[in-house]
Amino acid sequence: YNLMIRDGLKITAANTEKMHVLGAPHQFEFFVKRVITRFGDKPIALASDHSGFDIKKQCKEDTMALPYIDVGTFTNKSCDYPDYVLQVTKLIQTNECSHGISFCRSGQGANITANKVKGIISALCFDEYMAQHAIKHNCANHFSIPSKYVDKAKLESILEIMLNTSFD
């Protein structure tokens, strides 16, 4: 500050809700890629296996007012979730999408698969609390939703939380 004052710069103060102090280049990169970009700023990547197909369809038709890219599956015929979850993670890695949501029966398989991919922070979200904390405290960019435990009303509520929560 002394150098700034010496050079004639005026230092002022203002109240702020939160402040992020950045040090190393990797911290700045994390901030730009993950913190500034909020859920819904870019298209959301969607995927499901056969058991998550119906709730993904509801998500797209009834509750998703956001732009999205659906990578499949497109039927409720038996299929393997990793084939689709990995496509979602690729869209996040290439920055085409900022976040992804994968639907399967328990959410666990999609969550485990996504977390194996570099740069992906996936969280299992079966209620509003889990969704809020996944973003607020873990800066998650992928969400696994279990079709066995989440109905349409709960999904609407979870998506609303995701839209209105930011990383602290």
Regions found by a protein language model. Name each.
Residues 1-40:
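Conserved alpha/beta core of the MobA/IspD/sugar-nucleotide pyrophosphorylase nucleotidyltransferase superfamily
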Residues 11-12, 43, 77-87, 98-102, 121-123, ...:
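Structural motif
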Residues 45-54, 128-168:
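C-terminal binding/interaction regions
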Residues 54-64:
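Short, solvent-exposed amphipathic alpha-helices that sit
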Residues 67-79:
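A short beta-strand-loop structural module common to alpha/beta enzyme folds
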Residues 88-124:
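Helix-adjacent hinge/juxtasegments
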